[in-house]
Amino acid sequence: MNPMGRKWANIVAKKTAKDGANSKIYAKFGVEIYVAAKQGEPDPESNSALKFVLERAKQAQVPKHVIDKAIDKAKGNTDETFVEGRYEGFGPNGSMIIVDTLTSNVNRTAANVRTAFGKNGGNMGASGSVSYMFDKKGVIVFAGEDADAIFEQLLEADVDVEDVEAEDGTITVYTEPTDLHKALEALRANGQEEFQVTELEMIPQTEVTLEGEDLETFKGLIDALEADDDVQKVYHNVADM
């Protein structure tokens, strides 16, 4: 069982509450939607990457006008280019952090991420210094009770499903990354329409618990990283956050 397992729904609830109050999340989704639409067709029915981003944007309650603006921009003649990046580092007392970025200026982003680590009790690491302690998984969360039935549905659809957990009226499905879309389609085919989370996540193999000053320092570091416009996702191995 993944260490994130039983408490995933609580983590999602906290994240949704935080992101919902932060307009930065809308701007970040705008960039992600633009990139997905620009790299393929601006139609989600013929562009699976765009469809996936729009599904996540819906879960984050991104306003329609933000989505439409990003797609319209992709349809235009703009040649703005964005590059994906990943940075790894350490916080206090064994905490590990992965930062995924999407930026039009790599030098700016690298400097900002390094500064965020340095000014908030962390240290940047080399590529691979942290990520080997995480596993990339597809994660799907939705309302439900019967984990066994969901597991059977996914197996029948030939989905490479790693685990299905049920707790407090919430089902959490873990898949191999390449089978996330396949799992979603299988669930939809069985009548599941609403999803709280559909994400590719970096799941820590082990977690650490921080307390007191260490915890406050770590929260400040995460806040500083997430405040950067170029940072799309921040993963870490700290429990109960």
From Swiss-Prot:
SUPFAM superfamilies linked to this entry: YebC-like
Entry keyword Ribonucleoprotein: no
InterPro entries attached to this UniProt entry: Integrase-like_N (IPR017856), TACO1_YebC-like_2nd/3rd_dom (IPR048300), TACO1_YebC_N (IPR049083), Transcrip_reg_TACO1-like (IPR002876), Transcrip_reg_TACO1-like_dom3 (IPR026564), Transcrip_reg_TACO1_YeeN (IPR026562), YebC-like (IPR029072)
Record GO terms (molecular function): DNA binding
Keyword Nucleotide-binding: no
Main localization category: cytoplasm
Locations listed in the record: Cytoplasm
A single cellular component GO annotation: cytosol
UniProt keyword list: Cytoplasm, DNA-binding, Transcription, Transcription regulation
HAMAP family (UniProt xref): Transcrip_reg_TACO1 (MF_00693), Transcrip_reg_TACO1_YeeN (MF_00918)
Family that this chain belongs to: Belongs to the TACO1 family. YeeN subfamily.
PANTHER family for the chain: TRANSLATIONAL ACTIVATOR OF CYTOCHROME C OXIDASE 1 (PTHR12532:SF0)
Name listed for the protein in its UniProt record: Probable transcriptional regulatory protein stu0195
The organism of origin for this protein: Streptococcus thermophilus (strain ATCC BAA-250 / LMG 18311)
